[in-house]
From Swiss-Prot:
Residues at which NAD(+) binds: 67-68, 140-141, 151, 170, 172, 183-188
Major site of localization recorded for this protein: cytoplasm
Enzyme type, top EC level: transferase
Localization of this protein: Cytoplasm
Active site feature: 67 (proton acceptor)
Protein name (Swiss-Prot/TrEMBL): NAD kinase
Organism per entry: Halobacterium salinarum (strain ATCC 700922 / JCM 11081 / NRC-1) (Halobacterium halobium)
Key words, A-Z: ATP-binding, Cytoplasm, Kinase, NAD, NADP, Nucleotide-binding, Transferase
Gene name tied to this protein: nadK
Entry superkingdom: Archaea
Keyword field contains rRNA-binding: no
GO molecular function: ATP binding; metal ion binding; NAD+ kinase activity
GO terms of biological process kind: NAD metabolic process; NADP biosynthetic process
Length: 282
């Protein structure tokens, strides 16, 4: 069995716990890979350090930190189940407490050896695609905007859902979020909260002029977004951001579709209590 470990960068507690889990797994004769930054901190870079893109070949990935660390791990893990250990304040994706981390990982290793699979649930991701390009699949949201926000930097957008026009306006941008991502960027832009069990996508305009309220639509919807011009007179590019990290830049006018990705993310271990996590947002 192969297990990958991703720890929050610059967090000594996360690095220490990563080292402890690694030693426990090695005692169980599990092959362990660690993200390159953490491997350097643990002085095992040559032996166990790997880029997170290699974690697609693992049977389980352990993310230690906050939701940002989980998103970072998910970009490289592909279909590999990810178990999140929560060192942050909220933790919508990380359900395992640090004190329970070693035992939780051990349980999944034993389950894999007994059944050939770890316990996990599928979580949708979204992807934007245009003529000859596609964004990195996003666990939280895909945001489409100009290279800068604010007066003089917005975009003119036409948004259609399953062929019907939802909105045509000027805005800083528009984002399409999953239920998981409804608590993140979407919420800060005035979008609604959506329970993780709901099969849906959320379309939220970012500071739109005379904008309609955010729209919750089906998970199987096709959202077509056309960016006609930029408010600054057409100069600059359109930025498509996946989970705020991976950026795709395209020239306007551009048309793209945003849909649920073919391959969902897989989250291992127990599910976080959605409403308990919400209470920590206050």
């Amino acid at each position: 069995m192969h297990v990958g470990i991703v720890a929050q960068r610059g967090n000594e507690r996360a690095t220490s716990l990563a080292g402890e889990i690694r030693e426990q797994l090695r005692a169980l004769e599990v092959t362990v890979w660690v993200d390159t930054a953490t491997a350097e901190a643990l002085a095992c870079a040559g032996e166990c350090g790997r880029d997170t893109t290699a974690f697609t070949d693992c049977d389980l990935v352990v993310s230690i930190g906050g939701d940002g660390t989980f998103l970072f791990a998910a970009r490289g893990a592909g279909a590999t189940p990810i178990l999140g250990v929560n060192l942050g304040e909220v933790g919508f994706l990380n359900a395992v407490a640090p004190a329970d981390a070693v035992e939780a990982v051990r349980e999944e290793v034993n389950r894999y050896r007994e059944t050939g699979a770890v316990r996990c649930r599928e979580v949708p991701r979204v992807v934007a695609a245009g003529d000859g390009w596609a964004s990195t699949p996003a666990l939280n949201e895909v945001a489409i905007q100009g290279e800068q926000r604010g007066h003089g930097h917005g975009v003119a957008v036409d948004v259609r859902v399953d062929g019907s026009q939802y909105e045509a306006t000027r805005a800083d941008g528009v984002l399409v979020a999953t239920p998981t991502g409804s608590t993140a960027y979407n919420l800060s832009e005035g979008g609604p909260l959506v329970q993780p069990s709901v099969d849906a996508l959320v379309v939220t305009e970012m500071c739109g002029a005379d904008a309609l309220p955010p729209l919750v639509t089906g998970l199987d919807s096709e959202i077509r977004i056309r960016v006609e011009t930029l408010d600054d007179g057409g100069e600059g590019r359109v930025v498509v951001a996946s989970d705020g990290g991976r950026l795709t830049r395209v020239d306007p006018p551009v048309e793209m579709t945003v849909t649920a990705a073919d391959e969902p993310a897989r989250v291992a271990g127990p599910a976080a209590d959605f409403f308990e996590a919400l209470s920590k947002l206050e």
